[in-house]
Amino acid sequence: MTGRGKGSKGKLGRDNATDDPVDLVYAAEKIIQKRVKKGVVEYRVKWKGWNQRYNTWEPEVNILDRRLIDIYEQTNKSSGTPSKRGIKKKEKEPDPEPESEEDEYTFTENDVDTHQATTSSATHDKESKKEKKHHHHHHHHHHIKSERNSGRRSESPLTHHHHHHHHESKRQRIDHSSSSNSSFTHNSFVPEPDSNSSSSEDQPLIGTKRKAEVLKESGKIGVTIKTSPDGPTIKPQPTQQVTPSQQQPFQDQQQAEKIASEAATQLKSEQQATPLATEAINTTPAESGAEEEEVANEEGNQQAPQVPSENNNIPKPCNNLAINQKQPLTPLSPRALPPRFWLPAKCNISNRVVITDVTVNLETVTIRECKTERGFFRERDMKGDSSPVA
């Protein structure tokens, strides 16, 4: 208890001093604040039975009951911060933050798409700092949006598969048409060795072609062989077409592309060997290999006497051809076969012109080949220039 006389401030009074009006005793209710003024510790005292506007600062010596000071110290330790309204407001402001963080965490767990949830939670975090009042409405809007997006994602696999299939078929059609156009464009292409012939002169030989186009299904290389006789008495060679089951793997396609490019560069000097090696990879059916070997061995003996009888003036090209057949070709790929497999099965006619169009990745290489000069060059060219077989 501390006493304070209204007449004499700062003086202590007695509890039962009611007779003397000067020294009245006032009971202290509690201590509100503490300060140090000029090195003296003072406490702001709330007097019992008096309004707060009558609170006064009293030095520590005027407080007789030490328990008031102890209660004040314990209250400050338990609260940890001074009891000021401004500080209380600052403490209450972070209270809504844990709710928004919990909601954001729950929203991130329930969402199927992790990337979308992260983006939406980051956007939601920025907006929650700006507008805390619209937090629940904004969260509901994001939840509805995520449901719509998940519904769209559930429909997306079929739609994506359909578009992918449509795009794939459209691309294959474009590749097929472009390769056909490029092959048709290069039909009249004539290599440099045949410098005397023109495109108008080669038009009768349009039927004797072999085309290698990109197939529609697998995108691999296939060869379509079309031959027609130079004279009316020669029978056409049966058409051979490689089916997708007989095609080579994708590695052979790349090797065929390299071989085709090499055939274009070496067309001047090695026009007879390199195109045949190119045919070996592109035009060999796996099923008829053994049959062609037997037929080639049987008819190889018949070809030697027949060729001089039909072409008596030019025996040298046939001899060169026989030498080339005896010499083993260097295998350009692991699956390259010897000449007896890829030579025509019935090749008793030696003056036939064969035009091969090899199309790989929208690039076409045209190869014209003949075993003799007759049929490859026109008769007037043979009279003027007796060049070897090109």
Curated annotation (Swiss-Prot):
Residues 22-390 are annotated as: Involved in binding to (N(6)-methyladenosine) DNA. Residues 177-200, 236-254 have a biased composition (Low complexity). Residues 73-82, 263-285, 305-314 have a biased composition (Polar residues). It is found in: Nucleus; Chromosome. GO terms for molecular function: chromatin binding; DNA binding; methylated histone binding; sequence-specific DNA binding. It holds the Pfam family Chromo. Residues 146-155, 210-219 have a biased composition (Basic and acidic residues). GO terms for cellular component: chromatin; nucleolus; nucleus; polytene chromosome; polytene chromosome band; PRC1 complex. One of its GO terms (biological process) is neurogenesis. Residues 26-84 form the Chromo domain. CDD domains: CD_polycomb. The keyword Nucleus applies. Residues 1-22, 73-318 are annotated as: Disordered. The keyword Iron does not apply. Residues 1-11, 131-145, 159-170 have a biased composition (Basic residues). Residues 96-106 have a biased composition (Acidic residues). Keywords: Chromosome, Nucleus. PANTHER family: POLYCOMB GROUP PROTEIN PC. Component of PRC1 complex, which contains many PcG proteins like Pc, ph, Scm, Psc, Sce and also chromatin-remodeling proteins such as histone deacetylases. This complex is distinct from the Esc/E(z) complex, at least composed of esc, E(z), Su(z)12, HDAC1/Rpd3 and Caf1-55. The 2 complexes however cooperate and interact together during the first 3 hours of development to establish PcG silencing. Interacts with stx; the interaction targets Pc for ubiquitin-independent proteasomal degradation. Interacts with Nup93-1. Polycomb group (PcG) protein. PcG proteins act by forming multiprotein complexes, which are required to maintain the transcriptionally repressive state of homeotic genes throughout development. PcG proteins are not required to initiate repression, but to maintain it during later stages of development. Component of the PcG multiprotein PRC1 complex, a complex that acts via chromatin remodeling and modification of histones; it mediates monoubiquitination of histone H2A 'Lys-118', rendering chromatin heritably changed in its expressibility. Promotes locus-specific chromatin compaction. This is Polycomb group protein Pc. The gene is Pc.
